[in-house]
Amino acid sequence: MSASSDAEMAVFGEAAPFLRKSEKERIEAQNKPFDAKTSVFVAEPKASYVKSTIQSKEGGKVTVKTEGGATLTVREDQVFPMNPPKYDKIEDMAMMTHLHEPGVLYNLKERYAAWMIYTYSGLFCVTVNPYKWLPVYNPEVVAAYRGKKRQEAPPHIFSISDNAYQFMLTDRENQSILITGESGAGKTVNTKRVIQYFATIAVTGEKKKEEATSGKMQGTLEDQIISANPLLEAFGNAKTVRNDNSSRFGKFIRIHFGTTGKLASADIETYLLEKSRVTFQLKAERSYHIFYQITSNKKPDLIEMLLITTNPYDYAFVSQGEITVPSIDDQEELMATDSAIDILGFTPEEKVSIYKLTGAVMHYGNMKFKQKQREEQAEPDGTEVADKAAYLQNLNSADLLKALCYPRVKVGNEYVTKGQTVQQVYNAVGALAKAVYEKMFLWMVTRINQQLDTKQPRQYFIGVLDIAGFEIFDFNSLEQLCINFTNEKLQQFFNHHMFVLEQEEYKKEGIEWTFIDFGMDLAACIELIEKPLGIFSILEEECMFPKATDTSFKNKLYDQHLGKSANFQKPKVVKGKAEAHFSLIHYAGTVDYNIGGWLDKNKDPLNDTVVGLYQKSAMKTLASLFSTYASAEADSGAKKGAKKKGSSFQTVSALFRENLNKLMTNLRSTHPHFVRCIIPNETKTPGAMEHELVLHQLRCNGVLEGIRICRKGFPSRILYGDFKQRYKVLNASAIPEGQFIDSKKASEKLLASIDIDHTQYKFGHTKVFFKAGLLGLLEEMRDEKLSQIITRTQAVCRGFLMRVEYQKMLQRREALFCIQYNIRAFMNVKHWPWMRLFFKIKPLLKSAETEKEMATMKEEFQKTKDELAKSEAKRKELEEKMVTLLKEKNDLQLQVQSEADALADAEERCEQLIKNKIQLEAKIKEVTERAEDEEEINAELTAKKRKLEDECSELKKDIDDLELTLAKVEKEKHATENKVKNLTEEMAGLDETIAKLTKEKKALQEAHQQTLDDLQAEEDKVNTLTKAKTKLEQQVDDLEGSLEQERKLRMDLERAKRKLEGDLKLAQESTMDAENDKQQLDEKLKKKEFEISNLLSKIEDEQAIEIQLQKKIKELQARIEELEEEIEAERASRAKAEKQRSDLSRELEEISERLEEAGGATSAQIEMNKKREAEFQKMRRDLEEATLQHEATAATLRKKHADSVAELGEQIDNLQRVKQKLEKEKSEMKMEIDDLASNAETISKAKGNLEKMCRTLEDQVSELKTKEEEQQRLINDLTAQRARLQTEAGEYSRQLDEKDALVSQLSRSKQASTQQIEELKRQLEEETKAKNALAHALQSSRHDCDLLREQYEEEQEGKAELQRALSKANSEVAQWRTKYETDAIQRTEELEEAKKKLAQRLQEAEEHVEAVNAKCASLEKTKQRLQNEVEDLMLDVERSNAACAALDKKQRNFDKVLAEWKQKYEETQAELEASQKEARTLSTELFKVKNAYEESLDQVETLKRENKNLQQEISDLTEQIAEGGKQIHELEKIKKQVEQEKCDIQAALEEAEASLEHEEGKILRIQLELNQVKSEVDRKIAEKDEEIDQLKRNHIRVMESMQSTLDAEIRSRNDALRVKKKMEGDLNEMEIQLNHANRLAAESLRNYRNTQGILKDTQLHLDDALRGQEDLKEQLAMVERRANLLQAEIEELRATLEQTERSRKTAEQELLDASERVQLLHTQNTSLINTKKKLENDVSQLQSEVEEVIQESRNAEEKAKKAITDAAMMAEELKKEQDTSAHLERMKKNMEQTVKDLQHRLDEAEQLALKGGKKQIQKLEARVHELEGEVESEQKRNAEAVKGLRKHERRVKELTYQTEEDRKNVLRLQDLVDKLQAKVKSYKRQAEEAEEQSNTNLAKFRKLQHELEEAEERADIAESQVNKLRVKSREVHTKISAE
């Protein structure tokens, strides 16, 4: 895949970063450090594979260190090499250096993490479901993929679609796109995108035409194709466990195209709608979307029309599972469905019928029935629901209920009424609901197809298959079996097609290759289902038996397959899971199936009485749905005498298999394109990938089999031209220069000259093929070679430059010597009298001549100036023409290339046509011969024709008789009706004989019904006979037409007959030979039978041994299970012992600590300590003994288990080898038996055939007749093919004529171009460099244009220099003339020097003109060469006239590209103007800073009020800190990104500083604003001082209050101890947080100082820029005085201005992006600062509580004085901290002075401070640890005076486990609190400094403060916010790299 530049990817718009890596990312990947020897993937149970680094290798074992830091030792076969970084996120996984499972998995994972969801894997495309919307299907993406080859664009479903479209047009072959995968993988979405693509690209210019021709359509064809999806999804899609929008039916959409590639029509075939979902759903699923759309109340008129409510729970059929789906808006979907119905042209009546039938199905589920008293008969339980359902279906409610409860059943020839139980009625209602819904769905598909059939001419189609994915549910029924079977068939088709194509590629290229069949892996499961005696066969057989049940079906399955087929298993019983009856091992996993109700589902019976009501319904739609329905009873009665095997009505499984076979036939007739959809995880989480799940799908989908072929074959392949161009640098001497050499031969020579294994590559016809990994080796060799070449080139260039410099130094030295010599000589003679006289007189002598020379020089100067102006004008004109010629040359090159490609294609097709022609001629010859043989049968055919004529006449007579019979029957019918009326009248009058009359009436009615049936049968016969008559007449006509031809064939047939007679004699002779052979074979057969009997006995013995071994295996397996259970029990006991040991250890540690802390207090405590210590030692010994015992037991069990496993493994291996050997021998014996049997059968057949050869001549005649018919069909096919070939030949002729015309046109264009080239020969200054650009594309052309522009500017500068020199000379001449006139004698020397200078300048000007002319001459030669090249190109064009149509297409595409680039140029100009406007708007941004500052003042007041409530948030803060840890982890990731952005922004700032020349006024305003900031900061400092004083006073009051309550606290000592435990834990956490915040503030100060240094440097750059501005102003004034140089100077300044504006625009955009990131980071900084403030209050509270305990201890203990001493020491430390704080205050004031000057850089400084967030946190944590160490050391020094203080300090840290308080602990608390008091004061001062720095951002703090208050509510949203930040960061990177 060629990597596109960011500029080329710009056409994809916002989708670019989701399709391909940016240039920056690709460069970073190539430069990323990588060690190919140690970087590997390692197999790991949890994550499947992990990235690791090899540490060591020893004895087949490898020790590695994983990414997570773990060290593993694995086998060498579990280690897989990692691909180099340049293959990261590769678009085609077949191109990877190392092909294996982990490489594919991690490539997909990394691309999925970057939201690149499409990836090629060789010949097909893999897509991973993103579970979120991505902007990769926008219209600009469709346009970008149109017409692109696969390798020209990133992987995408649009690329697959466009390739299929292009293949259809070029190969003239039907295409199909198979989108397969498991349920929930995204197949339906990709199907929509395919249809969207075709509907977009294939309708240009056709919409009006379609609208005109459609007439009745409500929308255009493309709209209708697109609208078919929403309608089908509403009625055919539902929520399942794995997919919210799962297609519950399969569809094959065929999109037909006309001859020009435009949309012609479309049709849809559907498969296996899951109609059971209408009445039943699982808990986590729901029914079809349409039910919930209707009840969404988006269209209230529907609710009223359908007589339903808006609550789905009111309807039993649709509320068994869930009723809402979060990802689907039912209201919007209803509008889309309703709109689709209108667009697809359904009539209003049909639309209403669809809704009414859907509502009726919902009402069906609510119909209630009950059992009659004392009977099993069911009766309606209310008629309200039935009335609604009947109303919606235009039925009579009473008739409907009667038909349900009392259906009429046909028994023999009579109909009787049958009673129904309640359950039977409910079953019938459910069946009717499913039938109505299914038939309505199929009717809608038929109507859609009618609407999409536009009757336009169509040639080829592209089919898109979207069928339900593989399903494994908790409850799997017949529907799931059918779906999974379909996927098995598709997977087998996929395997066969894809892998055969890959291997045929090798054969096509002429590479030796042994074919590997990968398509039979799934045959076992497929045969188990569909072959005779398979599951479907047994199911249909059971449906034939009236008394068959599910149990009998299951028993037959078990008898037939259980234990005989490896894919058929008995499921395991799992509690809580649905019952399963058998399991099948599919390619995607094992599925448990429940066969309940399969027989009924397969027969699909309906209540015929209700169906009859449907057929008579006034609703036309309902009546038409069931118009063709035939009852099972009628069919079964009719079939008894006709068929033996099955009924005439089709079962569901038979119909399914028929449709599936049709589908597979369709697919095999097309060229398929495969898209494999992958589910990344089971939880539908965007961005998450489960390794095992993905690997399972990759194995099932054939991805890894494809890689297996790549590993065996040659996955890397390069065209010879590309290989020569790229790798020629490896050995340039291998390819001779200056002579033509074929690319293939050059590649062969090049590879032969390189030291690589020759078996690792193969040469094909057009490509060179490489084994996996070799291409990576070649790339490394190429990189090394390029490095050497570049180093050598640099050395040569440096040497050349130094030599040039040395020559210049020598020339200057010689010039100095010459000048010095002449000056010395002149100084010696200038005072001579004669010389003075000479100086005075000589000018007078030549004054007149000088004037003439001056005049002449002026004229020459003027002429030179005019010529220069003309030259400039011509040069501009030539430059314009040159650009045109360059474009034309590029166009011609593209045309030549495209025509060459087209010519190659045409030649290939021509060769294929010639081959086909030869084959067809051979076939024609063969057919002709056969046709001659068929003439012999002509007489018989003539006789048959006469016989058929007689039969026709007889049939006509029969038809006449039938018509008479029909009339007679009609009369009898009328007579019968009259008789019935008479009988009815007699019945009214004769009550006495009513019984007899009733019987007679019944008999008459039956006779009447029989008559009607007979009449219907006769009518059917009449219709059949009419059709037969028509068919026979057509056959007669055909026979008459072929009569003449067969007469001609008769003679040849007679000759063939004679030939057959000769063959008969030969056959009789061979019969005798066969008899002899038979006798020999009989003898051999007897021997073989004897051997077979021996082998069979041997096999039986081995089978007995095998059975014994299997029993032994089972026993060993049971023993293994017992051992495993023992191991598990031992593990459990060991875990329990470990837990007891840990508990004992913890208790012992607590006891020891208490003993140590209480040691020395009293003698009782000492004794208790000794006892507890003894107990502790005893417990420890017991624990160690128990541990050793457990370890020994576990080791013994492990050893036993390992030995058992090894022994079993050896036995199993031996058994497997024996079994394989026996199976092999068995198969060989079977083959021999089959061969012998076949030979015997062949001999017997040959004997019988030879004996009856004479009698078989008649059979041969009949066979010849069949052959004649076949030949006739072949002749017709050949005739059609010949016509098609003639049409194609005519088309080719027309194309040749068009190309001839185009060639002549191009010749004329060539002549015109030649004339233009001759006119432009004189002054093409830049043609030399443009020559090189002709070999490159538009990128190189731009580069050449830049070079031309630079040279043009150099010429302009030279011209300006000449003009300045001439003007200066003119001024000097005028001065000299004036001086000469006043004092000619005295100024002779000066005039002479002026003359010399003037002459020298004129000479320089002439030399420059000559140089220009020389360049023009050089360019004339170059132009001549260009002309020759153009002529060569024109010759190439003439040779490529066979593909001119493709040339026109390429030309139009290139014109589009040029137009796009022109548009981009215009856009660039517009952006330049816009940037000038943006420069004026910069001043407004400065006011934003001021507004932000004012908002910060308001925030200060808000924060003051909020600080009063912080006391109540301590408990919340503890939880928030834990959550903050997670956020810090995310911040660390963000920090890395921000650091990278900081570097980019810093570089951009350096560029942007040049654009600040015009910002002096802004700087002044900023200084004024900073003065205001300073005053505000001073005021805030004063306010903070007041707050600190207030806090001190509050603390004093609290201390006094604590002293007064000391006695009360002594009584509540135990309670205080418990409180203190919690407080101490909180105190430690708060101290850490305070230290963290304090260090963050200190680090911010340090970073701020660094930033000040940077800003000072920036100020210096600004000063330099200002000085540069003054210089520019002076230069501008000089330019204005020089009118003749004005234009050149203006152009220079304009170019400078444009560059400056672009830099400023880039910098401003980057500054805006950076400010957004700064805002985000400010919020995080705010979190830390606010936390710090809360912690200050928390510490003060904790301090007050701790001081209460301290006061109590001071009065109770004698050693409180030592704690006071320690407090004094801490006071000294406090003083030191105060001094430090004062020093920091002075530094702060100095910094504020600097801030005043550079306020507008404050955001960047804060960003720099915040970007080091993680490092600051680490430093702060380190500092916290240092301070804790200092505290501990200080406590140790204090412990010298107080024994045991150190133990008490440790005890304070573990207060949670302490139950008693003693005096030593109080002393330690006193010390700790004193230190905390000092620290708090220091922290407050430092917090003030941090707050002063952050006060400009306080307005931004409000947002995060609010987030902290609602932390618990936002916990679930935190991760999504981090993801958004990542996406935003990527967009910023993308924008920066793009700009």
Swiss-Prot record:
Stored SUPFAM superfamilies: Myosin rod fragments, P-loop containing nucleoside triphosphate hydrolases, Tropomyosin
Primary location class: cytoplasm
Myosin N-terminal SH3-like domain span: 35-84
Domain of life: Eukaryota
Coiled-coil region list: 844-1939
Gene3D superfamilies the UniProt entry points to: 1.10.10.820, 1.20.5.340, 1.20.5.370, 1.20.5.4820, 1.20.58.530, 6.10.250.2420, Kinesin motor domain, Myosin S1 fragment, N-terminal
Chain positions with Phosphoserine modification: 627, 1093, 1097, 1163, 1238, 1244, 1262, 1293, 1304, 1307, 1475, 1496, 1515, 1555, 1575, 1601, 1604, 1715, 1727, 1740
Domain IQ: 783-815
Binding site for ATP: 181-188
Domain Myosin motor: 88-783
Gene Ontology molecular functions: actin filament binding; ATP binding; calmodulin binding; microfilament motor activity
Pros-methylhistidine, modified sites: 758
Chain positions with Phosphothreonine modification: 66, 71, 421, 1242, 1256, 1266, 1287, 1468, 1502, 1518, 1731
Keywords: Actin-binding, ATP-binding, Calmodulin-binding, Coiled coil, Cytoplasm, Methylation, Motor protein, Muscle protein, Myosin, Nucleotide-binding, Phosphoprotein, Thick filament
A Pfam family this chain is assigned to: Myosin_tail_1
Family (UniProt): Belongs to the TRAFAC class myosin-kinesin ATPase superfamily. Myosin family.
Record note on domains: The rodlike tail sequence is highly repetitive, showing cycles of a 28-residue repeat pattern composed of 4 heptapeptides, characteristic for alpha-helical coiled coils.
Role played: Muscle contraction.
Name this protein carries in UniProt: Myosin-8
Organism whose genome encodes this protein: Canis lupus familiaris
Gene: MYH8
